[in-house]
Amino acid sequence: MRFAKAFLLTLYVALGFFELTAAAQTAAQPSVYAIKGAKIHTLAGPVIDNGIVVIRDGKVAAVGVSVSIPSDAQVIDAVGMELYPGLFDPITQIGLEEIAQVSATVDVSELGDFNPELVAATAVNPASAHIPVTRANGVTHVIAVPGTSGFDSQGGGTIAGQASAFNLAGWTMDDMQIQRSVAMVVNWPSIQTRSFDFSTFSFKEKSYEDAKKEYDKSVNELSDWLTRARHYAQAKEKGSPALFERDLKLESLVPVVQGKLPVLVIADEERDIKNAVEFCGKQNLKMILGSGAEAWKVTALLKEKKIPVILGPIERLPEQEDTPYDKPMTQPSELLAAGVPFAFSSFGTSFSRRLPDYAGTAVAYGLPHDEAMKAVTINAAQIFGIADQVGTIETGKMANLIVTNGDPLEVQTQVKYLFIKGQLTSTDNRHRDLYEQYRKRPQAAH
C-alpha cells in the first residue's frame, strides 16, 4: 500500500509537470509574427524581393512589400534568406510506423483485404521520432496513407482504408489534423506469376492461369463492394432509420461511389494502370494514381481522363530491365510535357525527409525548378482538395512556411525558421542530437 501511494504521488507530480510544461510552451508562443527582408516565393505569383509576411492566429494575414508590421508582432529578420511554403509529402507512413522491424510499432495496415472504414488519423502517433527529423528538412505537412508499407507497397489488402492529411507539429491529432479523410486507398490487384516471399526469403512462382484467376477474383470483389455501397446509400436514404442496420464498411464507401471522395489507386505497371483507369471509369470514381512507375507509358490516357499522379521515390530502378536506367528521374518532366498533373512523395517513413532531394534530382534530369517546387507544395494540395488551406503563401491560408538560407531543393540548404500553423517550430531532432553528441566526443591522444 505504501509503495502504491508513493507510486501514485510520483505519477501525479510527473503528470502535473507535463501539463505545466505543455501549457508553458503554448503560452510562450506569440500569435503574431512578421518575417521581413526575405525573398518570398509565394508560388501563387511573382517572387517578392525584400518582402514582408505577417502571420496572425495561425494564418497568413498579409504578404507583400509595403506591408505594415503590427506593433504586437515578433519580428524575424530574414534579410538574405528565402521564404517558401512548407513542403508537402502526400504519401507517407509517418506516425503509423516507427521501427519497421518491430511489429509493435507498426500500424500501417489491418488484417483482411477490405477495410474502407479504417482512417489513418486514428492511428497516427504525434510523438513519433520521425516527425521532427522530417520537418527539419522543410516538410511541414503530410498525408498518412494506410496499407502501402513494404517493398511491394501491397501490404494492406485491396481497400486499405482512408488517408489523412495533418501537420507535423502538435500534441494530438486534433491539433495536427488538416483533413481527416482525403482519399480512399486502393491497392490495385496485379497479375503476378512470380512474387517474393519474405517469410522464406525466396521467390514463388505460379502459372499465368492461376495468377489471372486471383486477379479476376480481387477485381470482382472490389466491384461487388462498390455495388453494395450504392445499394446501401439508396437504402439509407429511403429506409426508416429505426429499421436500418448500420454497416461502417459500406457507409465509408458511400462518399466514394458518390464522387465526393477520390480513390488513391496504387499501381505501377502499364497494364495495371490501364486496368485501374478503365475500372474507375466504369464505376464513375474520381481516381488519383499513386506510385505510377510506368505512368510515362500512358500519359495520353491519363491526360484524357484527367487523372493526376502522385509519384513514388524517383531515385529507383525502372520496373523493366529494358527500360532506360534514368526513366524514373526523367518521368516528371515527361508528365509535365504531356500535361499530366503530378506531385512527388516519399512512400515511406524515414525517407520522407528526402522529399526535397527527389524534386532536386528531377530538376537535374530536365524538370524546371519552379515546377519541381510546385510538385512538393501546391500540386498535391490541389490534387487532394486542400489547396484552400496549404500549398502557397496567400492571405487567409494556413501559415506553414519555411525560411531557408538557399534553394530548398539543394542538399546543403538549411531551414533556419520553420512555421507550422503559424507557430515557430523547432528543427531539433534525433539526427542532429546524435551528430552533436559524436562531434563532441573526446579525441584520442596522438
What are these regions (language model features)?
Residues 27, 31, 40, 44-84:
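Histidine-rich, glycine-flanked metal-binding segment
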Residues 26-27, 40-52, 64-65, 368-376, ...:
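Acidic, glycine-enriched loop/beta-strand segments at the rims
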Residues 99-100, 105-117, 262, 303, ...:
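His/Asp/Glu-enriched, well-ordered alpha-helical/loop segment
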